[in-house]
Amino acid sequence: VLPSAVFEDSPIFPCCERVFKSKTRVCFQEKINMHIRKNFRYPEIAQEMGIQGRVYVNFIISKDGSITNIRMRGPDKNLEKEAARIIGRLPNMTPGKQRGRPVRVPFSIPITFRLQ
């Protein structure tokens, strides 16, 4: 999970508010990865067609902490749709801040779809 820029205070995932400031980024990454694993469903049609690959998802954590502007790039529309569904289900966050003010923070994350 990569923020596209550097901010004084990165967004904070719910339940990461109580960790030390130096650990909030690690907590954020762990919680996002856990969210992806928990909500991941391989699209049936993609399984049947043997489609796999990596979908790159770009999104913004807005000034109010909501997830907006979800954009995907991947090998198949069904995989892209599932990646958007997973990211769209992320909870509202504590927004990132610059000079004490909430700011929009762009993120990029790859989601890998691999058949077993």
Where are these regions (language model features)?
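Charge-biased low-complexity segments
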Residues: V1-Q116
